[in-house]
Amino acid sequence: AGRPEFVVHSPGRVNLIGEHVDYNGGLVLPMAIDRGTAIAARRRDDRKVVMWAEAVAQQDAFDLDRTGRVNKCDWCNYVRGVAALLARAGVDVPGADVVIAGDLPIGGGLSSSASLEVGSGYALLALAGAEMDRLRLAQLCQQAEHQFAGVPCGLMDQYAVVFGRAGQAIRMDCRTLAHQLVPCDHEAIAWVVLDSKAPRKLGASGYARRRKECDKALAIIRKAGHDVTSLGEVTLETLLACEDRLGETLTRRVRHVVTEIGRVVEGSDYLSIGRYDLFGRLMYASHR
């Protein structure tokens, strides 16, 4: 009973080009989509947050003074993490009743988790009468996923949700955390995202293993005397010089990062001039 004080809509995102590049300090090209997460919230008189998630028909409740992780409830941990880190950042987060709904397929690769995190952040900030810089909120939501969900994600997903604009892709530099908006809306084309129905969880998809392999490759390249702080700074020449040290698997990982960054640069230029045919070829190359 009763009406919400605030309703927040937080979009999902799709990454056009730039897979496995965000945590390697490279360039990525995501865009926000028209599906997302809706969060209705109102203040309570106590220190509890009571949540209902429509998509999974689950309830969760926690005390703001003792916010911890729970087992076997991913969505609960995303919201718990955001609430805890907002409080740690000095926001006076109030008790709240929260209802979560949306039309993003969970585990479909459209950043349902980042959408939920960012939406929760904005809803709790609104209830607290507080504001936060968009980049800072994106970083806080990323940390919530690291600390409460145990997923070592890069920043791209939260960043794309926070900075996304209709009809624009985001060319994001994951090293400097700056971005440019790239027009990608044209009456002659439509972006179609198909749900394969194959569930995907970052925590169990080999994502963490691949991230460790990239970290290992960077350590080897640095040990060989190359002054780089991320794989995003590695050139093709540097990769060729280190192939023997890296071995086949790590060489493949680094080559993907180097060539993928090139595709983001080229692809954003193609989008800017409306050459969707050439952009499409780069998408095929990216997914090989």
Segments predicted by a language model, with ranges:
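C-terminal nucleotide
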Residues: 2-13, 38-72, 168-288
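ATP-binding N-lobe of GHMP and related small-molecule kinases
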Residues: 1-114, 118-134, 139-143, 148, ...
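Hydrophobic side chains within alpha-helical segments
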Residues: 22, 160-161, 198, 263
